Amino acid sequence: YEMKYRLVCSEMCIRDRPTRLVHGDFSLTNVIVNPKTNKISSILDWELSTLGDPIADFCYHCLQYFINPILGDINQCKELNIPNLESYRDMYMENSEFEISESEWNTYMGFSMFKLAAIAQGITGRVRDGTAAGKDADKFFEQTVSLADLGWLFVQK
């Protein structure tokens, strides 16, 4: 997987995008929603924030559409006003200064899957060492290879 990861990283140099402040772990689990307005009132968990590529940050955020068991089938969440992935991506591109081709999108999504696989592998190491904090941390071992495989499928599209 290391060689595949290196290939994905080299492909991400497709465009020289401007650097922006990126969250690093933006997801629905890291926001507080105002129950009266249904709008995000706070964004939490900024310890991974840095200056970086906003498209990479957005694509990592979009992994929720593929791997978030809490939300179930997020593409079926119209009643919650959650758009499907294609609509969400289009809205982001329309409201940002960035454009991304389908090929670039797949490369960025593959990179995001590899990133999450690396995080899962790190958690697996903490389970092995007895330093894992989460009660379900031992389940990450099973997901590491699957995430890397899914990342590679994206890159090959």
Locations of regions flagged by a protein language model:
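Single conserved hydrophobic/aromatic residue that forms the stacking wall/gate
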Residues: Y1-C9, C13-I14
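Solvent-exposed, charged/polar functional surfaces in cytosolic regulatory/catalytic domains
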Residues: E11, M91, N95, L150
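Active-site acidic catalytic loop and adjacent metal/ATP-binding pocket
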Residues: E11-A56, Y60-C62
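Conserved NTP-binding catalytic cores of kinases and kinase-like/nucleotidyltransferase enzymes
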Residues: I32-S41, L71, E97-I100, A137, ...
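Active-site activation/catalytic loop segments of kinase-like enzymes and analogous catalytic loops
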Residues: A56-E97, F111-D129
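Short, surface-exposed loop/turn segments at secondary-structure junctions
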Residues: I74-N75, E102-E104, G130-D136
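All-alpha amphipathic helical-bundle segments outside canonical DNA-binding/catalytic cores
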Residues: E99-F111
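Regulatory N- and C-terminal appendages and interdomain linkers associated
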Residues: G122, R126-K157
